[in-house]
């Protein structure tokens, strides 16, 4: 959904912001599916505003494409990539490999009938387990072609820039730092399989052994361990986990970053988070573009008021009216200067 994608994107960049202040800089960046937009914003190929607009356009386009072509996805565990592709071909229906995540971890997607047929065949071929996924469409398959066409126009307007730090593409698992290349790669990603395993192997071939996952989840860390022999991995989900990262890097004194090509959030972008679990209801008179003072009530979660601890301009609500939220889940995005 739009809100889930935007929340993940902004939350990941807030962690990146904290890491950058320590002077920790990457040799390469990569992101799984939506995470590719975070990686491009981190390296400066996209500005923060451009990234937000593209993520919103992408999620909306995927939602409508999913409604036009009803589809589903399933994780196939314990079967080689080529055998999963055989299962899809033998199903003789609309079903394809959508994610090559790690050795023995592949996701298929397509029509409900196609995924069901391929799942049965995958088990016959020796899959240890096939797990249906609760998703709103057959992402990264030809079912997303309408979304790809719509997103292509938005990407052209964003005009991705060249970067010094290369980003590994989901589409071809190669390192790219030319903005013009990303104009086509990002739109192709929607209807092409995510070659995440191959992205990890590309980084390993380029000499990467330390993999740091930033943002909510922690799933990619496990994939790196399964894919790259001798990989050192760590997941940093929140800025509060920076001490863990410093210890992992065996750094006694934080270094000061002298140069960074990506988008600095620092004191500019802020998230207002939920004070409790419950159903969020925004205040009707507070809209996008409203100037917010410290302590302004943006809405309620149950009986708890959602107050902004920052002054700034409301850019967007991340949670929608009636959405069930958890404590500290992002509710709104403000720009403070």
Place the predicted regions along the sequence by residue:
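Acyltransferase/transacylase module recognition
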Residues: 1-24, 156-257
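FabD-like malonyl-/acyl-CoA
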Residues: 1-84, 129, 133, 210-239
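Alpha/beta catalytic cores of group-transfer enzymes, especially the acyltransferase/condensing modules
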Residues: 5, 43-191
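Structural motif
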Residues: 29-32, 98, 214, 301, ...
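Short, well-structured beta-strand-loop connectors
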Residues: 35, 286-300, 321-333
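Short phosphate-engaging motifs
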Residues: 80-83, 114, 220, 241, ...
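Acidic, low-complexity mobile loops and tails
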Residues: 257-316
């Amino acid at each position: 959904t739009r809100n889930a994608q935007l929340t993940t994107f902004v939350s990941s960049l807030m962690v990146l912001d904290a890491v950058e202040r320590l002077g920790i800089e990457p040799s390469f960046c990569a992101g799984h599916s939506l995470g590719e937009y975070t990686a491009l914003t981190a390296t400066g190929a996209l500005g923060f505003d451009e990234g937000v607009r593209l993520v919103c356009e992408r999620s909306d386009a995927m939602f409508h494409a999913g409604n036009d072509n009803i589809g589903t996805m399933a994780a196939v565990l314990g079967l080689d990539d080529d055998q999963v592709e055989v299962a899809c071909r033998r199903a003789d229906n609309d079903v394809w490999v959508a994610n090559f995540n790690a050795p023995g971890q592949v996701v298929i997607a397509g029509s409900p009938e196609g995924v069901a047929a391929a799942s049965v065949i995958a088990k016959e071929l020796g899959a240890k387990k096939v797990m249906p996924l609760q998703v709103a469409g057959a992402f990264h398959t030809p079912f997303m072609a309408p979304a790809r066409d719509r997103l292509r126009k938005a990407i052209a307007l964003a005009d991705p820039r060249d970067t010094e730090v290369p980003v590994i593409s989901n589409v071809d698992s190669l390192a790219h730092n030319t903005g013009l290349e990303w104009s086509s790669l990002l739109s192709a990603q929607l209807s092409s399989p995510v070659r995440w395993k191959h992205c990890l192997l590309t980084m390993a071939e380029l000499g990467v052994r330390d993999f740091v996952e930033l943002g909510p989840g922690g799933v990619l860390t496990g994939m790196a361990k399964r894919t790259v022999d001798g990989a050192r991995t760590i997941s940093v989900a929140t800025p509060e986990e920076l001490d863990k990262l410093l210890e992992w890097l065996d750094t006694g004194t934080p270094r000061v970053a002298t140069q960074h090509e990506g988008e600095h959030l620092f004191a500019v972008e802020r998230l207002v988070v939920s004070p409790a679990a419950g159903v969020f209801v925004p205040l009707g008179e507070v809209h996008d573009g409203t100037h917010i003072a410290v302590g302004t009530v943006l809405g309620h979660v149950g009986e708890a008021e959602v107050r902004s601890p920052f002054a700034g301009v409301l850019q967007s609500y991340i949670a929608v009216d009636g959405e069930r939220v958890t404590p500290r889940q992002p509710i709104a995005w403000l720009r403070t200067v």
